[in-house]
Amino acid sequence: MNPEHSPLGKATVYAAQYDASLLFPIPRAGAREQLGITSALPFFGTDIWNAYELSWLNARGKPQVAVATFYVPAESPNIVESKSFKLYLGSFAQSKFDSLDAVRDTLKRDVSAACGASVSVQLVSPHDFGKLQMEELDGLSLDRLDLDTDVYEPDPSLLSAAQDEAPVEETLVSDLLRSNCPVTGQPDWGSVQIHYVGPQIDHAGLLRYIISFRNHTGFHEQCVERIFLDILHACKPLKLAVYARYTRRGGLDINPFRTNYNQPMPDNARTARQ
């Protein structure tokens, strides 16, 4: 399905009852082909979705609320368009469910079907809200650099690394990531963490490269995969992981993670801007 056929940018009609058909899948293949990925993926990882506006009725009609987290594997054939996800979650509001487990099972079944792969779902009830973490991405901030730039479309030629020197291990972060929705043109604001082992990447060039996404149109997942591949090809690290946390829209935030080596899943901790 093409993004142009999704609910994005169209007048919204909110469902009165639970409706799984509201979920609008978008194949990953098209964007990946544009990046030159036509066979085996050069990475693995997860898209972490947090939903803060989930509510339903219990069997007696009393409203219930929870924060939901969805873990969508990067190898799934589809992503779900975010506005359709919002409308789908909104359809729970006037529908009765017998238990929290029933809601979780319904979410897992529907979102897994839309994505074409098994999606893990966690629900946090109000009595556990205090346990939800908030912290900034760990690493050396690139934003400390005072530099000039005038490139606002992705340009991998900005990237370079010291190929003739001994490899290093670094974790670098920036809060200056911005991209734009390919359907509505609305800006998407994010923070990005880059961990690598290999030739030392030029920090100023990397920051200019991150800034160069400022006028780019692409879904969150596609932008992170482009960043991953551009760094991999231009800088040739032995190990690479890219993790972005985008600010919330419509009660949802999307946090893609891509890596080419085995490591634990990153913490799903909100940043201050989320």
UniProtKB/Swiss-Prot annotation:
GO biological process, one term: tRNA modification
Record-linked Pfam families: QueF, QueF_N
GO CC annotation: cytoplasm
Primary location recorded for the protein, binned into one broad class: cytoplasm
GO molecular function: preQ1 synthase activity
Active site positions: C181 (thioimide intermediate), D188 (proton donor)
Source superkingdom: Bacteria
Keyword Oxidoreductase annotated: yes
Catalysed reactions, as listed in the record: 7-aminomethyl-7-carbaguanine + 2 NADP(+) = 7-cyano-7-deazaguanine + 2 NADPH + 3 H(+)
Enzyme Commission (EC) number: 1.7.1.13
Binding site for NADPH: S82, K83, R249, G250
InterPro entries: GTP-CH-I_C/QueF, NADPH_dep_7-cyano-7-deazaG_red, QueF, QueF_N, QueF_type2
The protein's annotated pathway: tRNA modification; tRNA-queuosine biosynthesis
Keyword hit for Iron: no
Residues the entry annotates as binding substrate: V80, E81, S82, H220, E221
This protein's UniProt keywords: Cytoplasm, NADP, Oxidoreductase, Queuosine biosynthesis
Gene3D superfamilies, per database record: 3.30.1130.10
Subcellular location: Cytoplasm
Family: Belongs to the GTP cyclohydrolase I family. QueF type 2 subfamily.
Biological function: Catalyzes the NADPH-dependent reduction of 7-cyano-7-deazaguanine (preQ0) to 7-aminomethyl-7-deazaguanine (preQ1).
Subunit note: Homodimer.
Protein name as annotated: NADPH-dependent 7-cyano-7-deazaguanine reductase
